[in-house]
């Protein structure tokens, strides 16, 4: 089971302004722009790095605008079984959007981690590259 750090997901009180900032100054490219989990989500590629944005203001001013760290795995069910077998509770069960399925867990210090798996058969060539699915 392979895993790698994939992205940081940020709240954006003005998502258009955030997108413009990262594209104009850092050469970011919008790879996906869609509605997931009730909000507009925009996935940006910035060089080899990745940023995801929620179209909503930060919910907790103490935590700032970082929502979660995304860790991609090639076998979400196996990862979930490994975590739960060792007593790490899931925040909720697996959510499946067809091309993307995920769950969340809390790491030490209450860092929210999104564990996710994507199905490259449902993605474009650019999206497959974004998720590094041809280079595990």
Q: Which functions belong to the PLM regions below?
A:
Residues 2, 9-51:
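Core segments of cupin and vicinal oxygen chelate
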Residues 4-13, 42-45, 60-136, ...:
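Vicinal oxygen chelate
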Residues 34-37, 59-61, 95-98:
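A short beta-turn/loop motif at secondary-structure boundaries
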Residues 20-24, 80-86, 128:
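Short, positively charged
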Residues 1-16, 67-69, 119-136:
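N-terminal beta-strand motif that seeds the catalytic metal site of vicinal oxygen chelate
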